[in-house]
């Protein structure tokens, strides 16, 4: 379970993380990870949100996918820098994925979106 202070809640927060200035995205067949570090949030807790659409499946399947993603990310909160908002969007294939696969994808994609862009180019 994610602590309350680490959750994205408002649609404005989701929009800023998905499309805001400085947002970064990396994706795979299972999930897409968006991250945004806003100067206004410097020093605050990292926040995480999940987007699991009806394309993933019915309500039971969507909730199962969200539970698995939440559990995987709760164990990785320490890797997310302070002031960073992360949104994880599940693709339909995520409904058949096991937790270990989701965890590996989260690790790989978090590394890609959280690596500073200047270091990535060098």
Feature locations, PLM:
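Positively charged, solvent-exposed patches that mediate nucleic-acid binding
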Residues: 1-122
């Amino acid at each position: 379970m994610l602590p309350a202070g680490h959750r994205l809640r408002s649609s404005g927060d989701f929009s800023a993380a998905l499309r805001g200035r400085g947002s970064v995205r990396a994706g795979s067949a299972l999930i897409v990870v968006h991250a945004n570090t806003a100067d206004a949030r410097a020093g605050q807790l990292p926040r995480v949100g999940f987007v699991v659409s009806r394309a993933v499946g019915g309500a039971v399947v969507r909730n199962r996918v969200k539970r698995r993603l939440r559990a995987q990310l709760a164990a990785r909160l320490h890797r997310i820098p302070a002031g960073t908002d992360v949104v994880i969007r599940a693709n339909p294939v995520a409904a058949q994925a096991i937790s270990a696969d989701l965890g590996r994808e989260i690790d790989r994609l978090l590394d890609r979106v959280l690596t500073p862009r200047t270091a990535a180019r060098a």
